[in-house]
Structures are given as C-alpha cells and as structure tokens.
Amino acid sequence: MLRTVLLGKIHRATVTGACLEYVGSISVDSRLLAAAGILPHEQVHVVNLNNGARLVTYAIEASEGSGAVVLNGAAARLAAAGDQVIVLAYGQGTAVELEHHQPQVVYVDAQNRIVSVHRSVEHAG
C-alpha cells in the first residue's frame, strides 16, 4: 500500500503578487523551490494563513533570488500581496520506502529569503 507524506514545505512565505490573467499556477523563486525539493510543474497545495483558503495548483519557477511568490489564474482570487502562505508538496511511497523519510522544510523571512532549511517538521507546543 502506498502512503502519502509531506516531501517539501516552504513555511510562511509572503505573497508578492497575484496575476489573474495568467494561465494558472504559483510562481515561486527557484531558490525556494530547490531548497524545499519541489520540482517545476509539481503539484503543490497552498494554504493562505490570512484567510484560510486552501488550493491545489502546480509550481513554476520565478527568477532565482527574486523572492517572488505569485498566485496566478483563478488562484489569484484567493490571496493578495502581503498574505502569508505555506506551500506544500506531497509524495507517495511504501512503508519501507518511507521508514526514514523526513520532509525538507524551508523557513523564510518577510522578503522570502531563506532563513533555515530543516529535514523535519518542528511542532509547536
């Protein structure tokens, strides 16, 4: 049986724009995608911490070092510049394949610069 687990996460990124007329997706600074292990065109879930919206789309690369996090197409209706979002990518594997799996979690500052990268999820509490 395959199980679905978190592969990579960009935590509390700041939305830098929304482009309703674009065909779709979320554009993310390629440096952030690479750090989280998220591939271009990979399915991602986006959670908006400001309004609670959740959506599924795919990631595309924005210019490296730009700090860009832009929701495109219909998703642009679910976020505004300045909102904080979490970008999550999931994968599947067997229990054996996942026995030692740890997700890549990227923490960023208000300008979407990488603060730290961890191979586990820290729990609040």
Swiss-Prot record:
Alphabetical UniProt keywords: Autocatalytic cleavage, Cytoplasm, Decarboxylase, Lyase, Pantothenate biosynthesis, Pyruvate, Schiff base, Zymogen
Gene: panD2
GO annotation, cellular component aspect: cytosol
Pyruvic acid (Ser): residues carrying this PTM: S25
PANTHER family reported in the protein's UniProt record: ASPARTATE 1-DECARBOXYLASE
Assembly and interaction partners: Heterooctamer of four alpha and four beta subunits.
Gene3D superfamilies, per database record: 2.40.40.20
EC number, UniProt record: 4.1.1.11
Pathway: Cofactor biosynthesis; (R)-pantothenate biosynthesis; beta-alanine from L-aspartate: step 1/1
Active site: S25 (schiff-base intermediate with substrate), Y58 (proton donor)
Protein name in UniProt: Aspartate 1-decarboxylase 2
Stretches of the chain forming a coiled coil according to its record: none
Cofactor field: pyruvate
One MF term in the entry's GO annotations: aspartate 1-decarboxylase activity
Modification note: Is synthesized initially as an inactive proenzyme, which is activated by self-cleavage at a specific serine bond to produce a beta-subunit with a hydroxyl group at its C-terminus and an alpha-subunit with a pyruvoyl group at its N-terminus.
Organism: Gloeobacter violaceus (strain ATCC 29082 / PCC 7421)
UniProt subcellular location: Cytoplasm
GO biological process, one term: alanine biosynthetic process
Binding site for substrate: T57, G73, A74, A75
Cofactor note: Binds 1 pyruvoyl group covalently per subunit.
Domain of life where this protein originates: Bacteria
Protein's job: Catalyzes the pyruvoyl-dependent decarboxylation of aspartate to produce beta-alanine.
A Pfam family recorded for this sequence: Asp_decarbox
Catalysis performed (reactions): L-aspartate + H(+) = beta-alanine + CO2
Family: Belongs to the PanD family.
